[in-house]
């Protein structure tokens, strides 16, 4: 799920305020989603359910390295503009602060004909998962959690 695209009645969304830290928003919504699954489906299902709500669009990850993203889509002419966006925020995870200034909207302003599946994948491959993990702490924490899970038989 992408936090800003969630309906207003999504689990815990009504408990989140604009001035909350992004980690607190994430914790609140994931907790309420997990609680809902537990109440509706029971412990046997809930213990296998790992709630995760991405606090930004996929394109937020592309701001992990503006240089690599621009290089990947062969648009080195926009590196400085991408860096300007990135430098306004603590992490790429903070960029998605409204539906009008979401990462994809910012990229579409710079890249005419931006195709999310094509350019997004090319950019992500150029950036690499290690850089995304380093720049996006909530995403990294979730991946670390998944990596530590025992295999189910």
Identify the function of each model-found stretch.
Residues 2-153:
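C-terminal accessory helical subdomains adjacent to catalytic cores in phosphodiester-
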